[in-house]
């Protein structure tokens, strides 16, 4: 049985004051013990969040890590080892905003996935297609290519300590959401691709849906057989909304 997971990606948001207020609001939420909950603050707030999550059922991750592990001459980058030293457990890898805006290729994403695990973090590998690719009927092709790069480079065994998030790019921050059936089709294809290498591992990998997940659509999405939770963007900055999404995953 796969444990549901809800992950909150705070993106480039927050001040010290607003982050403290948000975590304090989380404390007042009735969060289901059956659901694994993680938040991904900006680098500048990771330490602050780690300092105040004691007593809150939330683990902490980073939104990115360097493509090399360890320490060394890579100005401006933060390694998985440094994030683990702070107390992080998770890291997002391959988010569409980094693929599209910052030009991260499938090869770079695969390197970051490997570096994350080498440093002791559990990666959340983000996959997803643009609106143009969906309208061209290429959704499954694009997602299979993105996943295939990591599978080929790192092997299916690497996914025993990783999570995959499907985020259709056209649904991120747009208010648009894939229907539960559209999302399930892609999630099933992802699990099938993993199963061609190892069915047991494939059955154990948690697959999250991201892309305008809200309290009013979460339950319908999470009811799908291969959707094990959500990667939540804007709604994770509202404690009541995020709490409701977590409770939907627990049901």
UniProtKB/Swiss-Prot annotation:
One of its GO terms (molecular function) is triose-phosphate isomerase activity. It catalyses: D-glyceraldehyde 3-phosphate = dihydroxyacetone phosphate. Signal peptide: none annotated. Pathway: Carbohydrate biosynthesis; gluconeogenesis; Carbohydrate degradation; glycolysis; D-glyceraldehyde 3-phosphate from glycerone phosphate: step 1/1. Keywords: Cytoplasm, Gluconeogenesis, Glycolysis, Isomerase. SUPFAM superfamilies: Triosephosphate isomerase (TIM). Gene3D superfamilies: Aldolase class I (3.20.20.70). The active site is at residues 95, 167. Its EC number is 5.3.1.1. Substrate binds at residues 9-11, 173, 212, 233-234. It is found in: Cytoplasm. Coiled coil: none annotated. InterPro entries: Aldolase_TIM, TIM_sf, TrioseP_Isoase_bac/euk, Triosephosphate_isomerase, Triosephosphate_isomerase_AS. One of its GO terms (biological process) is glycerol catabolic process. One of its GO terms (cellular component) is cytosol. Its main location: cytoplasm. Belongs to the triosephosphate isomerase family. Involved in the gluconeogenesis. Catalyzes stereospecifically the conversion of dihydroxyacetone phosphate (DHAP) to D-glyceraldehyde-3-phosphate (G3P). Homodimer. This is Triosephosphate isomerase. It comes from Stutzerimonas stutzeri (strain A1501).
């Amino acid at each position: 049985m796969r444990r549901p997971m809800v992950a909150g990606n705070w993106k480039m948001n927050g001040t010290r004051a607003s982050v403290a207020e948000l975590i304090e609001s989380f404390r007042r939420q009735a969060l289901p013990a059956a659901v694994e909950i993680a938040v991904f603050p900006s680098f500048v707030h990771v330490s602050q969040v780690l300092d105040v999550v004691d007593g809150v059922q939330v683990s902490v991750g980073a939104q990115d890590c360097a493509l090399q592990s360890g320490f060394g001459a890579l100005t401006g980058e933060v390694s998985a080892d440094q994030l683990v030293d702070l107390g992080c457990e998770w890291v997002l890898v391959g988010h569409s905003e980094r693929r599209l805006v910052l030009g991260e290729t499938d090869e770079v994403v695969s390197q970051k996935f490997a570096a994350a695990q080498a440093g002791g973090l559990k990666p959340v590998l983000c996959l997803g297609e643009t609106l143009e690719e969906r309208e061209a009927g290429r959704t499954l092709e694009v997602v299979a290519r993105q996943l295939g790069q990591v599978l080929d480079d790192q092997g299916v065994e690497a996914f025993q300590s990783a999570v995959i998030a499907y985020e259709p790019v056209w649904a991120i921050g747009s208010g648009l959401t894939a229907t539960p059936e559209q999302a399930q089709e892609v999630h099933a294809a992802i699990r099938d691709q993993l199963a061609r290498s190892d069915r047991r591992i494939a059955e154990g990998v948690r697959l999250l849906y991201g892309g305008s997940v809200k309290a009013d659509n979460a339950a319908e999405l999470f009811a799908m057989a291969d959707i094990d939770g959500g990667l939540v963007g804007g709604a994770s900055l509202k404690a009541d909304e995020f709490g409701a999404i977590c409770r939907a995953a627990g049901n």
